[in-house]
Amino acid sequence: MKEKIVLAYSGGLDTSVAVQWLIDKGYDVVACCLDVGEGKDLDEVYQKALDMGAIECYIIDATEEFSDEYVSYAIKGNLMYENTYPVVSALSRPLISKKLVEIAEKTDAVGIAHGCTGKGNDQVRFEVAIKALNPELKVFAPVRAWGWSREEEIDYAIQHNIPVPINHDSPYSIDQNLWGRANECGILEDPYAAPPADAFDLTREIEDTPDTPDEIVIHFEKGLPVSIDDKAFPLDELILYLNDLAGKHGIGRIDHVENRLVGIKSREIYETPGAEVILKAHKALETITLTKDVAHFKPVIEKQFAEQTYNGLWFSPLTDSLKLFIDSTQEHVTGDVRVKLFKGNATVNGRRSPYSLYNEKLATYTKEDAFNQEAAVGFIEIYGLPTEVNSMLHGGYSNEQ
């Protein structure tokens, strides 16, 4: 009886070729494809996996789990790798790994295979997560093992009649989920080349966007968006709704050269229309609901959390601790944020909360002012005392300094 390998199957070039490669190595292949909100035709993927030679194919709808257990932390934690990339692909990898391990244990497979190259981040994310969840499982990386170029891989697919939606003229590598879309390879590898129109799918060119704006009010409960214009949505449906609405306005395009975990720089094109709107609105609500010290310290945690996610360390004690901190900060992040969507921009123009720390009577410069300005004299004297003492001792600062 042949040993079984569970393959993370997407229906794309790498994993389609990997099915045949694993069969040639003497394994039975159990394909596993997750829906994390990318809108893929899963019936087609299922049939394609079987046509490629897989003995079984599991199709798992994990969209709700992805939004509730993973994207929720991207929102509450304002996760942005290098202050630019909202960890789109990285965020789905721990969930995919979790499901692969569950299928491997269910089918008595000896290991798990993925279609990642030896140059990317995903190989690290998958393998570290799998070993964290079940150290006994073997991990196979066919693409890394055979060492082919993208062109050689395409040629192999053509020779073996493996249908893939890719060719030498359009060799993009695309990954998409609920939180956004990532695109690389081909002409995009030249960091000076402008991305062609066919590199985008979720967002319109600015020239093709409406000439009138849309204005929406997003309601948040404990850090998460729950309704738009008083219409309630589950989180996954709310994100998909905003992907459509904001994408129509050309919002969410990111052209980024990032520092990969494996030590190289990579040019990536991201489309994150819903994420951009939600994160801007969430940050705006935090400005009136978080205390000054929390608001100033939270970005330190956010940066570390984003790096943990990007670097494949979702299943780790540190990430568990970071989640607890983030959750504790969101207890009062409840309220409404008004956002205007127009010509590539999501602009916050209003925010309110029953837990707002903004006191209009203290902030106003009108006759309603309740701020005790006389108290400023003593505050300034004490606040500036260390500076004054230092200048008395060392002679003060000259104008040249």
Swiss-Prot record:
<dbReference type="InterPro" id="IPR048267">
    <property type="entry name" value="Arginosuc_syn_N"/>
</dbReference>
<dbReference type="InterPro" id="IPR023434">
    <property type="entry name" value="Arginosuc_synth_type_1_subfam"/>
</dbReference>
<feature type="binding site">
    <location>
        <position position="85"/>
    </location>
    <ligand>
        <name>L-citrulline</name>
    </ligand>
</feature>
<dbReference type="GO" id="GO:0004055">
    <property type="term" value="F:argininosuccinate synthase activity"/>
</dbReference>
<dbReference type="InterPro" id="IPR014729">
    <property type="entry name" value="Rossmann-like_a/b/a_fold"/>
</dbReference>
<keyword id="KW-0055">Arginine biosynthesis</keyword>
<feature type="binding site">
    <location>
        <position position="121"/>
    </location>
    <ligand>
        <name>L-aspartate</name>
    </ligand>
</feature>
<feature type="binding site">
    <location>
        <position position="115"/>
    </location>
    <ligand>
        <name>ATP</name>
    </ligand>
</feature>
<feature type="binding site">
    <location>
        <position position="258"/>
    </location>
    <ligand>
        <name>L-citrulline</name>
    </ligand>
</feature>
<protein>
    <recommendedName>
        <fullName>Argininosuccinate synthase</fullName>
        <ecNumber>6.3.4.5</ecNumber>
    </recommendedName>
</protein>
<keyword id="KW-0436">Ligase</keyword>
<feature type="binding site">
    <location>
        <position position="270"/>
    </location>
    <ligand>
        <name>L-citrulline</name>
    </ligand>
</feature>
<comment type="pathway">
    <text>Amino-acid biosynthesis; L-arginine biosynthesis; L-arginine from L-ornithine and carbamoyl phosphate: step 2/3.</text>
</comment>
<dbReference type="Pfam" id="PF20979">
    <property type="entry name" value="Arginosuc_syn_C"/>
</dbReference>
<dbReference type="InterPro" id="IPR024074">
    <property type="entry name" value="AS_cat/multimer_dom_body"/>
</dbReference>
<feature type="binding site">
    <location>
        <begin position="8"/>
        <end position="16"/>
    </location>
    <ligand>
        <name>ATP</name>
    </ligand>
</feature>
<dbReference type="GO" id="GO:0005524">
    <property type="term" value="F:ATP binding"/>
</dbReference>
<comment type="similarity">
    <text>Belongs to the argininosuccinate synthase family. Type 1 subfamily.</text>
</comment>
<feature type="binding site">
    <location>
        <position position="173"/>
    </location>
    <ligand>
        <name>L-citrulline</name>
    </ligand>
</feature>
<keyword id="KW-0028">Amino-acid biosynthesis</keyword>
<dbReference type="GO" id="GO:0000050">
    <property type="term" value="P:urea cycle"/>
</dbReference>
<dbReference type="GO" id="GO:0006526">
    <property type="term" value="P:L-arginine biosynthetic process"/>
</dbReference>
<feature type="binding site">
    <location>
        <position position="122"/>
    </location>
    <ligand>
        <name>L-aspartate</name>
    </ligand>
</feature>
<keyword id="KW-0547">Nucleotide-binding</keyword>
<feature type="binding site">
    <location>
        <position position="125"/>
    </location>
    <ligand>
        <name>L-citrulline</name>
    </ligand>
</feature>
<comment type="subunit">
    <text>Homotetramer.</text>
</comment>
<keyword id="KW-0963">Cytoplasm</keyword>
<dbReference type="InterPro" id="IPR001518">
    <property type="entry name" value="Arginosuc_synth"/>
</dbReference>
<dbReference type="InterPro" id="IPR018223">
    <property type="entry name" value="Arginosuc_synth_CS"/>
</dbReference>
<dbReference type="InterPro" id="IPR048268">
    <property type="entry name" value="Arginosuc_syn_C"/>
</dbReference>
<dbReference type="Pfam" id="PF00764">
    <property type="entry name" value="Arginosuc_synth"/>
</dbReference>
<keyword id="KW-0067">ATP-binding</keyword>
<dbReference type="GO" id="GO:0005737">
    <property type="term" value="C:cytoplasm"/>
</dbReference>
<feature type="binding site">
    <location>
        <position position="117"/>
    </location>
    <ligand>
        <name>L-aspartate</name>
    </ligand>
</feature>
<feature type="binding site">
    <location>
        <position position="121"/>
    </location>
    <ligand>
        <name>L-citrulline</name>
    </ligand>
</feature>
<dbReference type="GO" id="GO:0000053">
    <property type="term" value="P:argininosuccinate metabolic process"/>
</dbReference>
